[in-house]
């Protein structure tokens, strides 16, 4: 199994589970107008450095100069009760609140009837799933940025994070 697109798409043996995807679209339906509004705003923004991507009609992504300013402007024009707007470096994301990684992990736990869930994440985008999991794995850099749940295994940064997790 692999959850991609912020948990909106489930791959089983490399193939997309269409029922999972359709359910994801239903879950975020109330956010659709805000996503479309963000696309319109970003398409007109001169700070944008990449076309605006509407990834699987689930969330919006682009790259911008001065991304913090872009996020601030979007937050003033879009309903932030329905969507999260943030940047990671020059990347700008608009993601329905209901399409969090934490919600995806909870859906997946029920889907496979898992008794125990272990997650690994390396950015602030991953924090919502840490509280859902029985065990979470994160790099030290994330532990210094925000408060992680007590059950989080914090890895030293000696190697590439994915290699540390697999060991």
Show the residue positions of the predicted features.
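Conserved mixed alpha/beta catalytic, RNA-binding, or beta-rich assembly cores of soluble enzyme
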Residues: 3, 101-102
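Mg2+-dependent phosphoryl-transfer enzymes with acidic/Ser/Thr/Gly-rich catalytic loops
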Residues: 95, 102-167
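Helix N-cap motif at beta-to-alpha junctions
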Residues: 63-70
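Short beta-strand
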Residues: 49-55, 84-87
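Glycine/Thr-rich beta-alpha phosphate-binding loop at enzyme active sites
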Residues: 80-99
């Amino acid at each position: 199994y692999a959850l991609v697109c912020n948990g909106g798409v489930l791959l089983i043996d490399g193939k997309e589970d269409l029922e999972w995807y359709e359910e994801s679209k239903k879950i975020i339906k109330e956010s659709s107008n805000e996503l479309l509004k963000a696309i319109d705003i970003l398409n007109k923004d001169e700070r944008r450095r990449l076309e605006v991507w509407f990834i699987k009609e689930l969330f919006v992504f682009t790259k911008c100069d001065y991304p913090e300013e872009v996020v601030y402007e979007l937050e003033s024009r879009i309903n932030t009760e329905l969507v999260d707007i943030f940047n990671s470096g020059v990347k700008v994301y608009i993601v329905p609140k209901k399409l969090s990684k934490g919600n995806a992990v909870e859906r997946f736990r029920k889907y496979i009837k898992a008794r125990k869930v272990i997650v690994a994440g390396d950015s602030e985008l991953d924090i919502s799933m840490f509280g859902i999991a029985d065990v979470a794995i994160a790099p030290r850099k994330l532990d210094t940025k925000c408060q992680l749940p007590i059950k989080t295994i914090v890895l030293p940064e000696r190697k590439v994070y994915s290699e540390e997790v697999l060991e």
